[in-house]
């Protein structure tokens, strides 16, 4: 019973840290697209296509 609880605790902590890490990465990419959108129109085409910014979404 105690080992099962420890396993669940570890999995929950791993998912929690993974979620935080993913949020940090997504936030960093969004900030990069926001600050550098329009400054480097020739680079990062695939990223700008998936960027939430409206100005970069219609740039092809």
Swiss-Prot record:
Record's compositionally biased regions (Polar residues): 40-60
Cell location: Host membrane
Membrane topology field: Single-pass membrane protein
Entry keyword Membrane: yes
Membrane-spanning segments: 14-34
Chief location: host cell
Region annotated Disordered, chain positions: 38-60
Record's keyword annotation contains Transmembrane helix: yes
Gene Ontology CC: host cell membrane; membrane
Keyword vocabulary terms for this entry: Host membrane, Membrane, Transmembrane, Transmembrane helix
Name listed for the protein in its UniProt record: Uncharacterized protein 004R
Organism annotation: Frog virus 3 (isolate Goorha) (FV-3)
